[in-house]
Amino acid sequence: MDNKLTHFDNKGNAVMVDVSNKNETERIAIATGTVKASSETIELIKSGQIGKGDVLGVARVAGIMAMKNTSNLIPMCHPVMITGSSIDFEIDSEKNEIRITATSKVVHKTGVEMEALTGVSIAALTIYDMCKAVDKRMVIGDIHLVKKLGGKSGEFNF
C-alpha cells in the first residue's frame, strides 16, 4: 500500500492532484451504506405513507444528483463527466434497515470512488430528512467503498 498522501505538496499545502499525464480508462466504483429506522418507519416507507412522498424515489434522484456534483462538495475532487450512475435500495424488515448501493461509471483520468460515496451519503440523508417527522432515532452508517475497477491502482474489493 502506498502511504503517500497525494493531496499535499512538499510544503504540506493542499493541492488538487495533477492527472494530466494519466490515461483515460473506464472506471467503476460501488459504495454502500445503511439507514436503520424503527419498524414502523420501515413499513411507512414500504407502503408509501410518508407524508413528504415517495421516500426512495426522491432519495434515488438526490443520490444521482449528488454524484454529478461531488466536485462542488469535496474540495480536491476532480470534476468528471459521469457516464453512468445508479442508486439501489434493499429493505431488510428483519433488521429494520435500508441498504443503499451507489454505482458510478466514468471514462476519465481519475476514479469515481468519491462520487459513489457521496451518492450513498446524500441518499441516506434524504431518507432521514423525509422521515424525521416520524422517526428522529434513525441511524445512518456503514458507508464504505465496496468495489473499484480501473485506473493505475487496479481493482479493489472490500
From Swiss-Prot:
Biological process, per Gene Ontology: Mo-molybdopterin cofactor biosynthetic process
Pathway annotation: Cofactor biosynthesis; molybdopterin biosynthesis
List of residues binding substrate: 76-78, 114-115
SUPFAM superfamilies: Molybdenum cofactor biosynthesis protein C, MoaC
EC top class, as a word: lyase
GO MF annotation, one: cyclic pyranopterin monophosphate synthase activity
Spans through the membrane: none
Top-level taxon: Bacteria
Alphabetical list of Pfam families matching this protein: MoaC
Complexes and interactors: Homohexamer; trimer of dimers.
Protein family membership: Belongs to the MoaC family.
Name listed for the protein in its UniProt record: Cyclic pyranopterin monophosphate synthase
Organism of origin: Clostridium perfringens (strain 13 / Type A)
Gene transcribed to yield this protein: moaC
